[in-house]
Swiss-Prot record:
Residues 40-68 form a propeptide. Expressed by the venom gland. It is found in: Secreted; Target cell membrane. The keyword Ribosomal protein does not apply. The modification Leucine amide is found at residue 36. Belongs to the non-disulfide-bridged peptide (NDBP) superfamily. Short antimicrobial peptide (group 4) family. This is Cytotoxic linear peptide. The lineage of its organism: Eukaryota, Metazoa, Ecdysozoa, Arthropoda, Chelicerata. The record marks 29 as: Important for activity. The keyword Secreted applies. Amphipathic peptide that has antibacterial activities.
Length: 68
């Protein structure tokens, strides 16, 4: 009886580990496919304007206005 109970507990633990890892790997796969898919790459192109390294005179004036 003790052996059967131990086998049942081990089976439940292994099943729980498998189901959690499957959900984690599924979420990871979905995130990677969204980033690397055609639509994901098109959306990343829109973010290039946010990382523009040039600062215009209007930007400097706005920052001075914020500082005062």
């Amino acid at each position: 009886m003790k052996t059967q109970f131990a086998i049942l507990l081990i089976a439940l633990v292994l099943f729980q580990m498998f189901s959690q890892s499957e959900a984690f790997l599924g979420g990871l796969w979905k995130a990677m496919s969204n980033l690397l898919g055609k639509r994901g790459l098109n959306e990343l192109d829109d973010l290039d304007e946010l990382f523009d390294g040039e600062i215009s005179q209007a930007d400097i004036d706005f920052l001075k206005e914020l500082m005062s």
